[in-house]
């Protein structure tokens, strides 16, 4: 077992604090509308330029192992905040650094660390209650656009695009961010349910110019096994022909005689038909087929459920307004499923999302949820260089997460104002002793730092501005760092999602409280390099007379 290096009390805390401050100083420059960039060296490829707090924090690894302990713990704050709210990572880091700094000073002065932590936790609870009480529900698309704009560092086009995407696919819809191949940033919306399986044969194409099969008002047969013969299906096929409507078959596979028969029927004009493979694999395929059946108001034809192909009737087939199939994807538009059944399925998937521990499973379930709930929007981020595209994509990701958080828990005045106003909630908080009071005082100081840092980054004097803001009793009165003017932050469109502010403070206080109450740190002792063996003396024989 490797030897360990152990440090105690103030020596341990001070060295961790140095690491915390190094990380916080690198992250805090990115905060606010005039936040600066951080350039990160990559072991291969071009350097990365970003204004995203968590991306900066994740890159920091310090040489001193004790300093690195502190840096890694605060890095955890940024990561946790990113997972919980997707934005506000810089704010969380600044808050954590401030609480750790003031808390370490207090412990060095002889205050009880456990009482300090209780005071900090008490203060955080009071502030969270205040934030929730003053949170304003997001109702208009303009407000959604404003939240997106603020999180994208003042880029209005990004805010507007996210607002449009949410309008199109609903709050439950999936919005993904991809890198575009062009200079422009654009929004692509796919309405209805789309899955990544195309037609099984080009003979099913109805529009030769666009190379797609479009079927209006079709019947949909959803079958979980392979189809190699159509013999068992003849009764239902004949029933569909009688109606004069097209038929779409979604099955594990359609092959051999079955596929040939369908193609011949299509070419002769007897039956308008198209066949596609079922999406997904294994259990996920079955779940997606059930989703399709519920969305279209049909029944999944499965022998496990005791339904055989020969017994299928028209009533068991799904319906949709239109189905569009190209080489790689199938889109079902306006499925005729029962609204209550679809809502029930959505609730079921939401419950599964809440229970799953796998990020991959969660992502796939969220995709299924969106497809049932109404659509998928893709934001394609463009730019003239790869570095620019990556930097912009970071901002768009943040903006998207912030707007989702705003829809969930409402909005508060931005620019650090919501936390400043929460100082009132700390007045007259009951405490058991003076050390707990000191813990509350530490939080009071910390919640002023985000507003101060935003002003400092914009070239102003943070302490002066914060002093002026605290003199006012108006809840939304704040400082617009973009223009250098004071005013009502909500009217100016400078708003933050309440969830982002709340989780930033909670995550910061959680880790900072642990750092303050640390009494010993253990790291691996640096290995002593063994001295190199002496070089053999005496020179090499037989080298005399050589001319160099």
Curated annotation (Swiss-Prot):
Pfam family, one: Cpn60_TCP1
InterPro entries assigned: Chaperonin_Cpn60_CS (IPR018370), Cpn60/GroEL (IPR001844), Cpn60/GroEL/TCP-1 (IPR002423), GroEL-like_apical_dom_sf (IPR027409), GROEL-like_equatorial_sf (IPR027413), TCP-1-like_intermed_sf (IPR027410)
Keyword ATP-binding listed: yes
Primary localization: cytoplasm
Binding site for ATP: 30-33, 51, 87-91, 415, 496
Keywords: ATP-binding, Chaperone, Cytoplasm, Isomerase, Nucleotide-binding
Catalytic activity, as annotated: ATP + H2O + a folded polypeptide = ADP + phosphate + an unfolded polypeptide
GO MF assignments: ATP binding; ATP-dependent protein folding chaperone; isomerase activity; unfolded protein binding
Gene3D superfamilies, per the entry: GroEL, GroEL-like equatorial domain, TCP-1-like chaperonin intermediate domain
GO cellular component annotations of the record: cytoplasm
Cellular compartment(s): Cytoplasm
Record function comment: Together with its co-chaperonin GroES, plays an essential role in assisting protein folding. The GroEL-GroES system forms a nano-cage that allows encapsulation of the non-native substrate proteins and provides a physical environment optimized to promote and accelerate protein folding.
Family of this protein: Belongs to the chaperonin (HSP60) family.
PANTHER family: 60 KDA HEAT SHOCK PROTEIN, MITOCHONDRIAL
Subunit description: Forms a cylinder of 14 subunits composed of two heptameric rings stacked back-to-back. Interacts with the co-chaperonin GroES.
HAMAP family reported for this sequence: CH60 (MF_00600)
Protein known as: Chaperonin GroEL
């Amino acid at each position: 077992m490797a030897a360990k290096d152990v440090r105690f009390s103030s020596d341990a805390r001070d060295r961790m604090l140095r690491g915390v401050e190094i990380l916080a100083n690198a992250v805090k420059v990115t905060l606010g509308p005039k936040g600066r960039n951080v350039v990160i060296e990559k072991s291969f490829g071009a350097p990365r330029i970003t204004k995203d707090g968590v991306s900066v924090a994740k890159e920091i690894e310090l040489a001193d192992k004790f300093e690195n302990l502190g840096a890694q713990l605060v890095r955890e704050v940024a990561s946790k905040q990113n997972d919980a709210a997707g934005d506000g990572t810089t704010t969380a880091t600044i808050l954590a650094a401030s609480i750790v700094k003031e808390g370490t000073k207090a412990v060095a002065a002889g205050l009880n660390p456990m009482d300090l932590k209780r005071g900090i936790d008490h203060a955080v609870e009071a502030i969270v209650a205040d934030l929730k009480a003053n949170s304003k529900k997001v109702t208009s698309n303009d407000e959604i656009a404003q939240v997106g704009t603020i999180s994208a560092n003042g880029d209005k086009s990004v805010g507007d695009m996210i607002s449009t995407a949410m309008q199109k696919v609903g709050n439950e819809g999936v919005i993904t961010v991809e890198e575009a191949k062009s200079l422009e940033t654009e929004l692509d919306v796919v309405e209805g349910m789309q899955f990544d399986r195309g037609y099984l044969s080009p003979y099913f194409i109805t529009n030769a110019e666009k190379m797609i099969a479009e079927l209006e008002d079709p019947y949909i047969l959803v079958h979980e096994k392979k189809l190699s013969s159509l013999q068992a299906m003849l009764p239902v096929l004949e029933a569909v022909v009688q109606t004069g409507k097209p038929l779409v078959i979604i099955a594990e596979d359609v092959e051999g005689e079955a596929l040939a028969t369908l193609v011949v029927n299509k070419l002769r004009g007897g039956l308008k038909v198209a066949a596609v493979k079922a999406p997904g694999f294994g259990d996920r395929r079955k779940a997606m087929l059930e989703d399709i059946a519920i969305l279209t108001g049909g029944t999944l034809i499965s022998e496990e459920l005791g339904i055989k192909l020969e017994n299928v009737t028209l009533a068991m087939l799904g319906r949709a307004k239109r189905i569009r199939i190209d080489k790689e994807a199938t889109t079902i538009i306006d499925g005729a499923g029962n609204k209550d059944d679809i809502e029930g399925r959505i609730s079921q998937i939401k419950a599964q999302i809440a229970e799953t521990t796998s990020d991959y499973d969660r992502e796939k379930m969220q995709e299924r949820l969106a497809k049932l709930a109404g659509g998928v929007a893709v934001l394609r981020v463009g730019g003239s260089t790869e570095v620019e595209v990556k930097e912009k994509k970071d901002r768009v990701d943040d903006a998207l997460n912030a707007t989702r958080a705003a829809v969930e828990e409402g909005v508060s005045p931005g620019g650090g104002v919501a936390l400043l106003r929460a100082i009132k909630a700390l007045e007259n908080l009951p405490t058991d002793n003076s050390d707990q009071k000191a813990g509350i005082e530490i939080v009071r100081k910390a919640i002023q730092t985000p507003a101060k840092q935003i002003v400092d980054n914009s070239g102003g004097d943070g302490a002066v501005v914060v002093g002026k803001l605290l003199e006012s009793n108006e809840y939304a009165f704040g400082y617009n760092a973009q223009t250098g003017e004071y005013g009502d932050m909500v009217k100016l469109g400078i708003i933050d999602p309440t969830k982002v502010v709340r989780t930033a403070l909670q995550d910061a206080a959680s880790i900072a409280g642990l750092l303050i109450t640390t009494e010993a740190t253990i790291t691996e002792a640096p290995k002593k390099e063994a001295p190199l063996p002496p070089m053999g003396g005496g020179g090499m024989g037989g080298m005399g007379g050589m001319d160099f």
